[in-house]
């Protein structure tokens, strides 16, 4: 018998790559595993050359089903194929009788499979909602809206079948209620975590840093993908308006994900470069992949540049920049959560962010005379002059030491956003629901009844006067699905159909 406090847990995730959602799944699985629970991750895709180290080295058990299925057709219908791949995965788990091997199944991102699991599994089902999928989809044009409609309805229906729903922030929780107005679920919040261990800085990144920055240089930092919705322009405008940028040794470093095959990345980088020109701020653009191709790093000298654009940097260089920056400028509005501010705070760096979305929960905004002992940065409207004022205020505070960001940031991250804190939240939410009896929904009862009725009629039509299929179904229901009610039904049908007069 399984001990009450040691659970068997399975995660179901669409694509176990190296994104933020994947990092959350890996951290959650590791945290629960370290608490003594038995954990496995099921996914439709996992490339061992492009995944997190804990997956690559076998620290976490991962099984893949359905990777042979396409992810799209001619660059379209991604949601259709994501649904097909997930349903294939779950059907394989059902056929292999794995769905009843777990006390808890955590479904991440895509909810389509939840009703199927609810019918065929005895496990408690938890859905982790990063953000309603229907709000992430683009709906340009009537055809696109019509195309998305059934998937929006499926999302609302499938989420309702979960035993419990959790979300990544109170901001997402409010959005969940506004989106799924007909659901009674009241999600709890489980914050994503940040790895508290430090990343080893590669030698090439140390050399590059010494080449790009002179002794005594200071810089503000922006880390975001080169996309318009990230509003990186706000950082440039605020920096240009700040008093601190007048100093020759002060720079702004803008770095983030960039793919030259993605038109938006290319266009937005050009737009930011043009904006720097408008403010008469000299700038240099460095494509990180070129660094390892060049033997002489002196070609990357940026002595006269006020703004440095860096594309697709390594985790090592990202860590080094966060360690050395004056402050992180986190520009996106209405972020669902936002992990980068936590990465800065864990290193004791202040963060300036927009006063909405996830940062309202992660950053403790400085209020003079009130919270010097706990402040970790500033939350301001996306108004350049207000951000410029915050930049200058941060400089004064760092000089006079009235706020100890080096202490406040790590303390806040460890308390609320560590792997231990996230694991504890998961365990608390599991214990709330895992002891409850399985709920049977009207649609579920109708669906099962209708399916059995159709089978019954099919047997009568295809195999008239043959009772043995009914006995097979009775045995199948009891031994395979552990459904004794329908086992009794089919046994009763068999008894009524058996030709006793031939005995």
UniProtKB/Swiss-Prot annotation:
CDD domains: GT4_ALG2-like. It is found in: Endoplasmic reticulum membrane. GO terms for molecular function: alpha-1,3-mannosyltransferase activity; alpha-1,6-mannosyltransferase activity; GDP-Man:Man1GlcNAc2-PP-Dol alpha-1,3-mannosyltransferase activity; GDP-Man:Man2GlcNAc2-PP-dolichol alpha-1,6-mannosyltransferase activity; glycolipid 1,6-alpha-mannosyltransferase activity. One of its GO terms (biological process) is dolichol-linked oligosaccharide biosynthetic process. Keywords: Endoplasmic reticulum, Glycoprotein, Glycosyltransferase, Membrane, Transferase, Transmembrane, Transmembrane helix. Interacts with ALG1. Mannosylates Man(2)GlcNAc(2)-dolichol diphosphate and Man(1)GlcNAc(2)-dolichol diphosphate to form Man(3)GlcNAc(2)-dolichol diphosphate. Belongs to the glycosyltransferase group 1 family. Glycosyltransferase 4 subfamily. This is Alpha-1,3/1,6-mannosyltransferase ALG2. It comes from Saccharomyces cerevisiae (strain ATCC 204508 / S288c). The gene is ALG2.
């Amino acid at each position: 018998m399984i001990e009450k406090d040691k659970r068997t847990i399975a995660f179901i995730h669409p694509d176990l790559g190296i994104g933020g959602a994947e990092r959350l799944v890996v951290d959650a699985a590791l945290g629960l595993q370290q608490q003594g629970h038995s954990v496995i991750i099921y996914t439709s895709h996992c490339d061992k050359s492009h995944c997190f180290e804990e997956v690559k080295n076998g620290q976490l058990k991962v099984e893949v089903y359905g990777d042979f299925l396409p992810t799209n057709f001619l660059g379209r219908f991604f949601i259709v194929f994501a649904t097909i791949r997930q349903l294939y995965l779950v059907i394989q788990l059902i056929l292999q009788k794995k769905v009843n091997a777990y006390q808890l199944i955590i479904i991440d991102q895509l909810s389509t499979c939840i009703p199927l699991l609810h019918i065929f599994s005895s496990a408690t089902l938890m859905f982790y909602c990063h953000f309603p999928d229907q709000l992430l989809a683009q709906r340009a044009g009537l055809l696109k809206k019509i195309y998305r409609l059934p998937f929006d309805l499926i999302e609302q229906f499938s989420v309702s079948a979960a035993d419990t729903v959790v979300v990544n922030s109170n901001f997402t929780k409010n959005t969940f209620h506004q989106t799924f107005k007909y659901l009674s679920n009241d999600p709890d919040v489980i914050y994503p975590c940040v790895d508290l261990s430090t990343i080893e800085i590669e030698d090439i990144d140390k050399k590059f840093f010494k080449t790009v920055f002179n002794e005594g240089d200071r810089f503000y930092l922006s880390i975001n993908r080169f996309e318009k919705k990230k509003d990186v322009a706000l950082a440039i405008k605020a920096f240009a308006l700040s008093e601190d940028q007048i100093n020759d040794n002060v720079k702004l470093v803008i770095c983030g994900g960039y793919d030259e095959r993605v038109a938006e990345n290319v266009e937005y980088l050009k737009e930011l470069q043009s904006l720097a020109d408008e403010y008469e701020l000299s700038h240099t653009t460095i494509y990180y992949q070129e660094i390892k191709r060049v033997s002489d790093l002196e070609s990357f000298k940026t002595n006269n540049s006020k703004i440095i654009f860096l594309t697709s940097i390594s985790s090592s260089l990202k860590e080094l920049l966060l360690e050395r920056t004056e402050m992180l400028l986190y520009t996106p509005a209405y972020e669902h959560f936002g992990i980068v501010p936590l990465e800065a705070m864990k290193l004791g760096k202040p963060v300036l962010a927009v006063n909405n979305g996830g940062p309202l929960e992660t950053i403790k905004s400085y209020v003079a005379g009130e919270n010097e002992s706990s402040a970790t940065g500033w939350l301001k409207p996306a108004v350049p002059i207000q951000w410029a004022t915050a930049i200058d205020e941060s400089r004064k505070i760092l000089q006079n030491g009235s706020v100890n960001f080096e202490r406040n940031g790590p303390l806040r991250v460890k308390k609320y956003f560590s792997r231990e804190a996230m694991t504890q939240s998961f365990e608390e939410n599991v214990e709330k629901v895992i002891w409850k009896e399985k709920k049977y929904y009207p649609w579920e009862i109708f669906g099962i009844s209708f399916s059995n009725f159709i089978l019954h009629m099919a047997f009568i039509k295809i195999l008239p006067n043959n009772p043995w299929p009914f006995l097979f179904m009775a045995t199948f229901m009891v031994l395979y699905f552990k459904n004794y009610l329908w086992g009794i039904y089919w046994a009763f049908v068999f008894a009524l159909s058996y030709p006793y007069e031939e005995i």
